Structures are given as C-alpha cells and as structure tokens.
Amino acid sequence: HSIRRRQRQMCIRDSYAIERSCQIKADVVAADETEQGVRAILNLGHTFGHAIETFLDYSDWVHGEAVSAGMLMAAQLSASLGYVSVAEVARIRMILQRCGLPITPPKSMQVDDFKRLMQRDKKVLDGQMRVVILKSLGTAEVTADVPETHLRQLLMSACGG
C-alpha cells in the first residue's frame, strides 16, 4: 500500500514526495559520480526516451513523458531477456498510466527512426549501442549485450508493427 500512497503523492505533485525523490536521486549520483554502477537506474528508459525527444524535435512531449514511454520499453526489453516478469512490467505500466504519463512512443515513430536515433545516444561506445535494462525491480545495468532480434521485436511491438 505504501507504493500506492507515494505514487498518489507524486502524481499530485506533493512537495514532500518531490523533495524526497530529488534527495534519493542526489544520493544515487553522489554514490556513483562516474556512472559506473548504481547510477544506471537513473538512466532507465533514456535511450528510448532520447530517441523519442529527438524524433519530436524536442516539442510536443517534455523529457519526462519521453522517458516514461522509454521506461516501459526498457522494462519490456528486460522481460524479453528474462530478467523481470510480465507481471512486473504490468506493474510499471500501471504506475505510469495512473500518473497520466505516456506508455507508448508517438504513433508516427517507426522502427527505423528508433534505430537511427538511438545510435546517437551518449551511451553508444565504440559504435555499440548500450541500453539500461532492469536486472530486477530497483536494479539496473548498462549493457550492449542485447540480441538484435530482441531489440527489433521490442521496437516492432512498440511501433505497432
């Protein structure tokens, strides 16, 4: 029940909940200033979200909306890789929906748009696209080890094809 209470507080922009969230983020950043470990959790959904933002030319959706859709995509990818359950993905979807956040990319965005734009992400290293995946709820890691078939299936599903 506490997650539902906190969720309601965040969705109504409760000042304490927002302040506490900012403090948690600051603590995570301080614990991992070089983005080598636990800080990856803060980037969950950003590879997909940044592609959405770029596709929309940084208009129509704010950063958090793009990252919201990206977070669900990252969770779905994590499930396809066997790290989190379908039920956990459904829980993430429900939380995002209850906050009125997008859970799918713009309808006009296609698989090739994602692939092209994701190659521009700051996490690309030596030409290898890296994404943040959930190893479990609350635990994330940056990886380049995502089979192309899993990524393509995710993008096709997200883009309605």
Language-model segments: residues:
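Single conserved hydrophobic/aromatic residue that forms the stacking wall/gate
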Residues: 1-12
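Oxyanion-binding "anion nests"
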Residues: 13-60
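Short alpha-helical scaffolding segments that buttress acidic/His motifs in well-ordered protein cores
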Residues: 17-25, 71, 96, 118
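Flexible, glycine/charged-enriched surface loops at secondary-structure junctions
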Residues: 13, 33-41, 61, 84-89, ...
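Internal helical hairpin/lid segments
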Residues: 49, 53-91
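C-terminal charged capping/lid subdomain of soluble metabolic enzymes
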Residues: 83-161
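Short amphipathic alpha-helical interaction patches enriched in hydrophobic/aromatic residues
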Residues: 25-33, 52, 56, 75, ...
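Residue-level signal for inorganic ion chemistry
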Residues: 46, 71, 137
